[in-house]
Amino acid sequence: MMRPQPPLFRPSIPMPHGLGDREAAILREIVEEYVETGEPIGSQTLAQRLQPSLSPATIRNVMAELARAGLLFSPHVSAGRLPTEKGVRLFVDGLLQFSSLTEEDRASIDSRLDIHGRSYQDILSEASSLLSGLSSAAGLVLAPKSDATLKHIEFVALGPGRVLVILVGSDGQVENRIIETPPGVPPSALVEAGNYLNSRLGDLTLGNLRERVRAEMDASRHELDALTASVIESGLATWDADGGTLFVKGQGKLLADITEIERLTTIRMLFDHLETQETMLQLLQLADASEGVRIYIGRESGMFGMSGVSMIVAPARNEAQKIVGAIGVIGPTRLNYGRIVPVVDYTARMVGRLLG
């Protein structure tokens, strides 16, 4: 089996002008320390690390310049400096060296995404777990609604006003949904609704079937019993509201380094946001806008409206280069971008092949 190609990374913004070698070296050291420990670093420590060496006084002057440029800040008076989100962005776009995927990581991804004897749902859930494990953050895998043609649809009564809809795809996948129906729907209406839809399946996808059935029902509603029509409409409306399946694993890792109540509240808000339908649609839009792996820092993605959170996302494409999902990692701003980007890229390529 051919392996996915090496990572492809597209920077989000051009490298800012006016950053000299000395400033770049100091910013790099500060961001790398932040990624590794989360702690600020001072001029004395930097003076010992930098080659060629600079005096602490010179380093303090450069740090002050970087702070005025909005790239650094001091968490409190006596501390060293930390990078701002703008500083992290500059580092990612112009200073970061992306590592190659190790053979160990490649073998781990290959084995964990082995599809033999497993469902697509299991594989996608496993993909989000492995992303979380390799990134020490939360792994995201979004699979949009399948475009497979339909084989069978069935409606089963569960109780007053509740019906189970069973959707069988030509690829063998089975999807179950519970819908609400008007009271008093008899079993005969459920059978008629199933027969009506099954007689029109042909080689249609769910989207194609939905368009055809709605057009026919608008033109010849009098031919259907009112309760039968309501069952059909409820089923179609349920699938309309579904943008896909989002797998999120490793949320607990986002809480590992949090001590402040304010940050804890932010992460809880993030958890709530991840469960919304809007998040799924936005993830697909972000993936659609990306040729390769894309990094969003803080509010850049437009999804969460909060600082201190970064997201790395890539589209999963099939052999025809059609987007069939989105793969990503979400975590604190001090993610290990150099390691995570090739992991996300390779996983996206593998998942794209599986979903394709």
UniProtKB/Swiss-Prot annotation:
Keywords tagged on the record: Repressor, Stress response, Transcription, Transcription regulation
GO biological process: negative regulation of DNA-templated transcription
Protein name: Heat-inducible transcription repressor HrcA
Family membership noted in the UniProt record: Belongs to the HrcA family.
Function according to Swiss-Prot or TrEMBL: Negative regulator of class I heat shock genes (grpE-dnaK-dnaJ and groELS operons). Prevents heat-shock induction of these operons.
Matches recorded under InterPro entries: GAF-like_dom_sf, HrcA, HrcA_C, WH-like_DNA-bd_sf, WH_DNA-bd_sf, WHTH_transcript_rep_HrcA_IDD
Keyword presence, Ion transport: no
The UniProt record lists the keyword rRNA-binding: no
Gene: hrcA
Recorded GO MF terms: DNA binding
